[in-house]
């Protein structure tokens, strides 16, 4: 995520702000229907004359791929060894606490109601990025799992949160705000869940971002169609639990698909409210550009639908480095140490995938 024209924090990694892909070949696995779709896009530059012949070639490629995949699954069993991971941050603990206090000053002055401040953790890359992704699928399964290999860097993610979705003419945003760690026992887990739902600070923060989500959905929905279908429910993941709500609206077709995406970008749950002033404060207080973190990852489909998630619980592997960024929502009564600990807890799932 980048604020146009702002250069207060440094760009320390050569990673693009945007990367768009238009693949020729797609393999779509529908896990609910237990079906696999193999799609081969044909473009004019290929100058194909016999499409039936091309179809048979593609089918042969698919069967060959299936055979190779089966062989790899049988012969490529590796033993995972536990490793001690040394982690450092781009922000010292004391500086992060100061960042929180400075944000609270801005809130007191009336500049903002809330802002999400983050820190970026860095560790040595101890295994292949694709192996980290495979481990995440087991240890931290999430609604959005993704792996992108751009040769000079890789993006690995297990995001819990929709950015904006258009499906069946319905716009969906699903704000997540409010966090507790998972308990070590069932009773401790229940304690944290109850504590989260009784925390006035967390509830007020979530309500604020839920209202922001309703406003975002309303920008590209038909009048009086926006509604909250889930409100203040708890979703649990491997290391943390969250308060989650769900907002839908009937898509107004006078808006383009791209405009619909921008209606919710960047998400208030990773920036703050009001968004623009919150982003200015983020740029002032954070030490390095966020880049992938808090941005959007997803697809636009040929059928006119799209689905995107927020780049949370997302790591970047570059050369021999592994980067994970995590944030916490700051409001008027935030406790700096508690917000610091929240960022650490959110980053644990990805850091532990290195072990």
Where are these regions (language model features)?
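Extended alpha-helical targeting/anchoring segments
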Residues: 6-7, 11-355
């Amino acid at each position: 995520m980048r604020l146009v024209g702002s250069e207060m924090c440094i760009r320390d990694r050569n990673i693009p702000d945007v990367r768009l892909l238009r693949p020729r070949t797609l393999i779509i696995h529908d896990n609910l229907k237990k079906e696999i779709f193999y799609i081969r896009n044909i473009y004019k530059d290929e100058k194909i004359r016999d499409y039936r012949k091309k179809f048979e070639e593609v089918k042969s490629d698919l069967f060959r791929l299936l055979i190779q995949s089966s062989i790899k699954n049988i012969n490529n069993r590796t033993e995972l060894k536990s490793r001690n991971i040394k982690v450092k941050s781009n922000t010292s603990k004391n500086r992060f606490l100061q960042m929180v206090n400075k944000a609270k000053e801005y809130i007191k002055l009336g500049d903002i109601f809330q802002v999400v401040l983050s820190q970026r953790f860095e560790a040595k890359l101890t295994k292949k990025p694709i192996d980290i992704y495979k481990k995440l699928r087991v240890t931290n399964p999430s609604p959005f799992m993704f792996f992108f290999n751009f040769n000079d860097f890789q993006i690995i993610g297990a995001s819990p949160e929709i950015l904006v979705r258009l499906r069946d003419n319905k716009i969906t945003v699903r704000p997540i705000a409010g966090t507790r760690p998972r308990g070590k026992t069932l009773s401790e887990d229940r304690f944290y869940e109850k504590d989260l739902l009784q925390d006035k600070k967390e509830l007020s923060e979530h309500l604020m971002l839920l209202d922001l989500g309703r406003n975002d959905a309303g920008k590209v929905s038909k009048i009086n169609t926006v509604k909250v279908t889930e409100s203040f429910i708890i979703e649990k993941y491997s290391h943390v639990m969250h308060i989650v709500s769900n907002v839908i609206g009937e898509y107004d077709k006078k808006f383009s698909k791209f405009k619909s995406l921008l209606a919710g970008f960047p998400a208030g749950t990773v920036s703050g409210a009001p968004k623009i002033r919150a982003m200015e404060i983020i740029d002032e207080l954070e030490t390095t550009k966020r880049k992938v973190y808090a941005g959007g990852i997803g697809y636009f489909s040929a059928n006119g639908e799209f689905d995107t998630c927020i780049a949370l619980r997302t790591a970047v592997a570059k050369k021999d480095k592994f980067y994970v960024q995590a944030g916490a929502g700051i409001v008027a009564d935030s406790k700096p140490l508690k917000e610091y600990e929240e960022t650490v807890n959110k980053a644990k799932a990805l850091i532990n995938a290195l072990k």
